[in-house]
């Protein structure tokens, strides 16, 4: 889904077309919850809570850092500890306020919760939606933009939703 949304186009119609293409090419039929998560550009944790009707939590499995980026692998778990989403994040520390980077380094909260709690004004740009036949999961890749710079690049695999 690397195509750009037409300037005078409708994001909803564009995403419907991309989801139809994904279903056709991969031979799968997506549930409404999966479609919602693929196109959503709000906080994934909040949307998952609404869709599942329960509290979800983020568990950071692995996190490493170099001078310019933090790489993170995490899962979002439902109330029965079932993995709903597996996320791989690349965080560009030079494009974020220090307090945000500090909270990320603590590994206690999900990125969406950190952004929401800090009232950081961001924009999410969906770069790709697809299907991984090996893992048998639908995924999306998106960027979170802060002050016109890419602050996060995230790939989410919808494993249990």
Q: What spans do the regions from the language model cover?
A:
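Conserved catalytic block of serine-dependent lipid acyl chemistry
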Residues: 143
